[in-house]
């Protein structure tokens, strides 16, 4: 079956594949757009699997405060170009929505399956490298900060009765933590020997 330039365009828009790949797929599938899209997806997933061991040193943090919890999700990729891609950012926000609505506290299969289509269309290795949930207990205030690089972030939870004052202080602590990368992030983690050295 013959296919037209409009068919190639429709397949490109549906799959994100290149023009030549779309033409080859349509030729292999006798002009059937649905079959060609399936073929391109299969080929794309196979190619994505080959990229799976490539380093993902770039990426973006997604942090949100919902109720008495602060949710953190880290989505990594190979290049900063992709980390700033609108589809990549939208996917991270959608993953955070799913994390919150389903009560996930760690990386789940659903997170990884949500990545598949974007891996195929963008052609980079990507990973959900972190999902964390920080509880904000009653009487405490939580705050967070994401630096302009979108990869560095911090969360601080502080007990206190003056909500406005504590919130400002917690946010200031977040800024300080992001800037100076402290050795310890919780009072209980600090060894007695280190405390003694500081006196």
Residue spans of the language-model regions?
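N-terminal assembly/interaction segments in proteins that build large macromolecular machines
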Residues: 2-199
